[in-house]
């Protein structure tokens, strides 16, 4: 499996008392700690297919097919701001692109 297939994600690495500053996305499948000050996660990973979650909106993982294929049941996506991140190469970080 090519390393570029990996998703971006945010994963907390400490207890809820950890002092945080800002969210970080990962490169080529390497997950960095979630450092979002607005949401507290108790050692529970938060991720989505191709983008780090916004700090102020806690979201479950949503498969891409739910967003692109209308024949699947649609989850509650009313408050989700969709941003697509593209990894052009294994050495490049995820780059935001307009939908």
Curated annotation (Swiss-Prot):
The keyword Repeat applies. Residues 3-59 are annotated as: 3 X 5 AA repeats of C-C-X(3). One of its GO terms (cellular component) is keratin filament. GO terms for molecular function: structural molecule activity. The keyword Cell inner membrane does not apply. Keywords: Acetylation, Keratin, Repeat. The modification N-acetylalanine is found at residue 2. Sequence repeats lie at residues 3-7, 8-12, 47-51. Interacts with hair keratins. Belongs to the KRTAP type 3 family. PANTHER family: KERATIN ASSOCIATED PROTEIN 3-3-RELATED (PTHR23260), KERATIN-ASSOCIATED PROTEIN 3-3 (PTHR23260:SF1). In the hair cortex, hair keratin intermediate filaments are embedded in an interfilamentous matrix, consisting of hair keratin-associated proteins (KRTAP), which are essential for the formation of a rigid and resistant hair shaft through their extensive disulfide bond cross-linking with abundant cysteine residues of hair keratins. The matrix proteins include the high-sulfur and high-glycine-tyrosine keratins. This is Keratin-associated protein 3-2. The gene is Krtap3-2.
């Amino acid at each position: 499996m090519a390393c570029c297939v990996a998703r971006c994600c945010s994963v907390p690495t400490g207890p809820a008392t950890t002092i945080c500053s800002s969210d970080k996305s990962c490169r080529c499948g390497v997950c960095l700690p979630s450092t979002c000050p607005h949401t507290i996660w108790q050692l529970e990973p938060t991720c989505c297919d191709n983008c780090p979650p916004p700090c102020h909106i806690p979201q479950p993982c949503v498969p891409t097919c739910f967003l692109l294929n209308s024949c699947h049941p649609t989850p509650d996506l009313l408050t989700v701001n969709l941003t697509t991140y593209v990894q052009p190469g294994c050495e490049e970080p995820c780059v935001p692109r307009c939908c």
